[in-house]
Amino acid sequence: MKRIILILAVLCAYAAAYAQGIGTAKDLQAFIQAYNNGESVMQWCDADTTICLSADIDMAKVKNLPQINSFKGKFDGKGFRLRNWKATRGLFLDIAATGLVQNLVIDSSCSLKSVGKGDEHHAGFIADNNNGVIRDCVNYGNVTHSCSYALAQSWVGGLVGYNKMIIYNCANYGEVTSDTSGELKETVLIAVGGICGGTPGKVPVVATVSRCVNEGKVSAVSSLMSLYIGGVAGYPGRATMKFCTNKGEVVADIRESEDGQTTGVARVGGIAGQTKGDMARCENFGAITSMGACSANIGGIVGMPHELLVVADCLNYGTVKSTGDLPSQTGGIVGNMGRPVHVHGCINYGDVIFEGVSSRNRSTAGGIVGNVYVPKAATAGAYVRSCINYGNISAGAGGNKYDSNNRNAVHAAGVVAYMEGREDLRSCVIDCANYGTINSKGGRTGSICGSAVSTTTGGAAPSDWAKALDAPAADGNLVGTVLDSSGKPWEGVMVTDGLQYVKTDANGRFAMNSDLNTSNFVYLSVPADASFLVRNGIPQTYKRIPRHAVAAEAHFILDRQNVAENYTVMMIADPQVRTFGVDGSMETWHDTVAPDVEAFRASCSEPVYCINLGDLVYNQMPAWDDYMDGAAKINGPTFNVIGNHDYDQGNMFETEQGSVYYESYVGPTHYSFDLGNFHYMVFNDIMYDRQSPTGRYYYGLDERTLAWVKADLANIPKDKVIITCSHHNPFKTPNTSPHGSHNAYSLNYKEYLSLFSQYKAVYAWNGHNHENFYYNYKGKNTPHGAPNIQCISVARCTGALRLNREIAAQGEPQGYMVMEVRGDSLSWYYKGVGTGKETQMRAYSPEKTSDATVKVNIWNWSEGWSTPEWYENGVKVADMSFTPGIDPAYLEIFNTITNKTTKKYCTPSDKAILFSVTPTSGVREGEVRVTDLFGNTFVEKVSW
């Protein structure tokens, strides 16, 4: 609400500066006529050809305003209002893919009364159909829809009826009501939402409803076969919904049709009735109710998610209640799901109540999810993880005739009332907790699950939340302590909210004034004399700040240890996993790479740490659960970096909207810690705030991350060695020959370069490029970078993209970089899966090459290495020539691929680091010798 008011205030402040634009109802009518006739509309444009309002528009005398057809330009309301408009359809009939409508306000004096005539019907105040972008618009008017005999679908919303693209930062305060009761065609559906009705069909990947708020009551009375109703969207289809809030009451009432048949099924949710797209960081405060002659799938967030998708980091505070005459599935977050939905990190505070009729079939009431079932065609199971319920659960008998051991009994539980898996699928309810009461008049109950069939259960909910306080302390609104495991205060520990740092005092206490609306975490920069407490491999150095808190406190415990002078860090890049059964990436991560990492870790005598350098998943947010499980196989602290593919690829406007998944599963996107004598800094340098669907992500540090870097380094002596870990290298990338391109155009490059150039040495590690690369700025004649900076890029650990076989596109084996720290010095080498340090190259005999030469692929060769030497009979014959090209072994694998999509993504690279030599005539064997930049000599023999 505050966000919307601020937007409107700013817009109104500068609106008077525009002399041109639409300033009266007559202007609006004239513009619509001219636009629809294909005539010039420049007289209503501002300097950049945007159609704009220049004043509030009084529509009291306007009758039957024509709609704006297929709008392809930009329309800016400048915060002005349409007043006294008695509408029957939206202002825009259709906003085209290139269209943008923004900053338009519909006043409370307006009303939309839309009457369906039986055919397909779309209605919303701003647009009946949206294929473009609608942003920063607000509706205060009431929307009323009715249809006495529906022959086709109806889509009704406060702002948009049928949405196939982007609705961003919009709000609805008007009531949205629909009445489709009566003698109606049974197969017809209706979708009703406070912001939009939605769409069932295909949508572009960028389709999103985000940062939207509904505060109006949304209600529907229907006799149709399917009713989809949500506080924000009825049925958004595959559009993602992120950072949306509902504060309005949502009521679904399915009634018998006039012929007495009971046909309806309601999907009812605080945010959406049904969805096939991800939902992240959404909240519901409104009461959600389903009643009448219907079955209902009803949830505080979504009634029925119906695809492989994620519902993550969502909160429900509203009461969820079902009183229908047929069986219903009722949940604090999700009502019913029969697809491989991943519900993660959600919390329910609202009461969940089933008081309906359920004589012959199962009905449920669950604090997080009501019912989970497995269809026969299922290839994957559902996950419910790291969720907490505080709401009270209540279930009536419902006239149910089954005893508690029957799957068709009424089920009530604190987390999932009825959880069905299958022996051949992975289904789980893990790391969840219930603090609410369970009251049921019959059937089966449980604190976590009422029934869990072929499902993995167990674990404990993570204790990673700070405690909300009623009021700030005298010295700050974010306070806490850091103690050691014996209870002794730990002085001097750096504590951050992701923007600023403070240090703990002699009592181990810290305090700061933080903007809790923008700070999601409070966390530590762990000192070198502390060991990491881990949960499933992830260091527990952070606490999540409760949303809406005015103040919070967080308490941390660390174990003291001697500073480890010698240790090893495994740098792992780009697992890029998709869910099991898609492209083999998850199988490779779980069965090949992670076990090899763990085996290597176990073989080391000194402490070992793991840093995963981003692109942990690959454009598929449901893969996060299984990625994390694979990483947990590494029995030691594992630090993670966010990469571009860790965002959902439809993300726009704000980087935070895409990083929400990483934050939900992993934690902060930038943080630091000390190991031995070195200071490690992990940060996000992928900017995903593109402003148009055709834009793309870019690189650099945003203002918040840059401020954090400054604050962090302000506490670090200049004689320290800094290790940076990011997905894209902040200084150098291997995009051009011979040494790659500099990143001088990255966001805030000069500022962060200036900061890092002041330190003794900086080693900048990254993934992203799917190849090994090294660059040392020392001695280079370039205006970029600094002589204290060295850059190291690591190849994709799971092999070539989409192929995920043992050899990657440049011929390097699946593997990772091993960094060995010995006091103040460090070195590194590439470790292939199943091999050791000694294996740094692969040689090919003349029989395997196209030019009858001996070739060797040295996949980690770089400046500082020696030129490879060719030996015959123990005697050096020649230096080998650098002849980059396609690796023969990888080409052999590639030629066996038949899938066209796979071949498209894993084409052999012509940049394999190959060296060649022509052997002496008659010689049938020899060896290659090469020395790396740390003085280690490697030998590879070859014979033919």
Regions found by a protein language model. Name each.
Residues A466-N477:
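Beta-strand-rich domain onsets/edges
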Residues A528-N536, Q540-H548, M621-I716, H742-Y763, ...:
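Extended active-site neighborhood of metal-dependent phosphoesterases/phosphodiesterases
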